[in-house]
Amino acid sequence: MALTATAERTNIDLHSDMIKKAENLIPVLKERSESANVDRRIPKETIQDMKDAGFFKILQPKQYGGFELDPHTFSEVQLRISQGCMSTAWVLGVIGIHPFQLALYDDKAQKEVWGEDDNTLVSSSYAPMGQVTPVDGGFKFSGHWQWSSGSEHCDWALLGGLIFPPEG
């Protein structure tokens, strides 16, 4: 019972810490919001600020360096970030949800992404713009995915594609 109470207290403290960090970033994000909108990309400094604050690790499993907090904490942080820059909040939402999704995958996939660097960010383009071909040991993706918010800051991507039935 004491162990559970301690874990819950730690999560409450982390939640509060994340909210404070997000609130502290609001003035900086307001200063950068015009350039983010004009350049149509979030400044590298902003991504680094969010990495340093741990925002991309809110939903990431603890075993891979994350905080493994609840989606409520993530959405509260995103809401605070939106007060400084809506575009930044959008990109945080897009990139920051992927640790939750990746945590649902087999551990082999998680090790592949976070095994060497638990700060690795993942983008996505779920629209099935590519073709998926089954090959020995997996699948081959080919195509052109036209957009993925925040992808220039990521090393991995979750992609959508179509598998066509074999001819014949």
Which residues make up each language-model segment?
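Basic/polar N-terminal segments that are highly enriched at the extreme N-terminus
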Residues: M1-K20, N24
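Extended active-site and interfacial segments that coordinate phosphate-rich ligands
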Residues: L158-L159
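Short N-terminal signal/transit or membrane-insertion segments
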Residues: H15-D17, E76, L162
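Glycine-rich flavin
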Residues: K44-D52, F56-D155, F164-E167
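N-terminal capping segment at the start of a domain
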Residues: L25-S33
